[in-house]
Every structure is written in structure tokens, then in C-alpha cells.
């Protein structure tokens, strides 16, 4: 299913120009934040993550193709109903920051082959704005994090694009609303390195800022395309 769907689910569609796939082995799942949230009620669920980039200003066309295509794949029996489908959502990339000015840019991130990835989700606190949260990350959290060995090389942050009403029934309708943001932190090292010093504390830092509420933080690693590597390490 993973080998088929990585391409047939999105990558062959219009406007989609990059994709990458990540896995969470048990050692990484054990590092996930465990607070109750609307994304992952069970912290041990969700072993694979596929991420795709598509061209800006093509959301309606691309989303329409995705819905019709996945419904077709369902009809062909190619959606592997036995899996746990934990979270699918579209995000509009609003900003990004890279550690090195001449380093990898966000449009090339999924082709770069970063060995580690951390997903960070949060909600803007009542009375505050996405712009304030962006400024806090850019001015406070990221400069410090990017100076540390555990820190990211590149970060992209997006806001929610609502799913189509006729999206497949097995796609979980997350409670995420307009205050939700989701960030992808790309690492040039194992995402478990320095976890307790670094990403284990990002939720508390977000809450302490008064600008955002922490939803979920989770580390991932690259899959090895064309193999079943890591399937024996998921639980």
C-alpha cells in the first residue's frame, strides 16, 4: 500500500512537485507528547507520514483531483482498509526559516533527504494572532533552537485548508480550525538526539509565551524507499 499510494495518492496529480515519507519506530513514538489532543488520541498510533508539496494558488484544483482520485482508488481496492488512518489534512505554508542563508530551501526540503523530522502542532491562543505566534517563533524560539546541536536546519509552518465535503469517509475529520498551525522541523540528524533538552520542552515554551496552546509534538525518521525496513520496529 505505501509503495503504491505514495505515488498514486498524490504525486502523480496536477501541481504536486515533491513528496517524502517518514516512519515512527517505537523508540520515536515513546518520545511523542502524550497530552490529550484531537490529532492522535492514542500516542502509539500513526507509524507512517507522507508529506507533499504543491504549487501555491492551486489549492482548489489540486484538492478536487485528490478527492476524486482517492475515491477511485477506494473503488479499485487500493486503499488498504486494514490500516489506521490517523490524520490527513491540507495546510497552506505561511512562512519558513532556514538555519543557513545558503542552506536548503523549503521548496527543496522533501527532495533533500533529511534524516530527521519533528512535527509540531499548536493553536493560537484566544485574543492573539498567527502573526504574533510567527514573530515569537522567529524572534525567540527558533534563534535559540537553531544554535543548538538538537535544533532544526529548516522549519516550515502552515495553517489549515479545510477538507472537501466529499473527501473519503475514512479520512478523519480533525477538530482543527482556523487557529491551528502545523510545523515541519527538518533535521540533519536523528530526531531523538537531544530530545529532552530540546523538543520535549517546546510545548511548555509555547504555553509560557501566552500566545499559543501546544497540541502535539512527534519525531520521525526517513523511510528507506523500496524496502520494508523498520516494519518490525513499530510497536
What does each model-identified segment do?
Residues 2-235:
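Macromolecular interaction modules
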Amino acid at each position: 500500500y505505501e509503495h503504491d499510494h505514495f505515488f498514486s495518492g498524490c504525486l502523480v496529480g496536477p501541481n504536486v512537485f515533491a513528496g517524502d515519507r517518514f516512519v515512527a519506530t517505537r523508540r520515536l513514538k515513546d518520545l511523542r507528547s502524550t497530552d490529550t489532543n484531537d490529532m492522535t488520541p492514542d500516542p502509539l498510533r500513526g507509524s507512517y507520514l507522507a508529506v507533499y508539496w504543491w504549487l501555491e494558488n492551486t489549492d482548489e484544483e489540486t484538492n478536487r483531483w485528490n478527492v476524486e482520485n482517492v475515491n477511485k482508488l477506494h473503488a479499485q481496492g487500493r486503499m488498504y482498509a486494514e490500516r489506521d488512518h490517523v490524520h490527513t489534512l491540507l495546510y497552506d505554508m505561511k512562512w519558513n526559516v532556514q538555519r543557513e542563508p545558503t542552506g536548503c530551501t523549503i521548496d527543496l526540503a522533501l527532495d533533500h533527504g533529511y534524516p530527521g523530522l519533528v512535527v509540531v502542532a499548536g493553536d493560537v491562543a484566544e485574543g492573539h494572532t498567527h502573526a504574533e505566534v510567527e514573530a515569537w517563533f522567529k524572534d525567540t524560539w527558533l534563534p535559540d533552537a537553531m544554535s543548538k546541536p538538537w535544533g532544526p536546519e529548516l522549519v516550515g509552518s502552515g495553517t489549515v485548508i479545510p477538507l472537501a465535503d466529499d473527501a473519503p469517509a475514512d479520512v478523519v475529520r480533525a477538530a482543527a480550525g482556523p487557529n491551528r498551525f502545523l510545523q515541519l522541523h527538518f533535521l540533519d540528524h536523528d530526531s531523538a538526539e537531544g530530545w529532552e533538552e530540546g523538543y520535549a520542552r517546546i510545548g511548555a515554551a509555547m504555553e509560557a509565551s501566552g500566545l499559543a496552546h501546544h497540541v502535539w509534538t512527534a519525531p520521525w525518521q526517513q523511510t528507506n524507499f523500496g524496502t520494508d525496513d523498520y516494519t518490525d520496529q513499530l510497536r
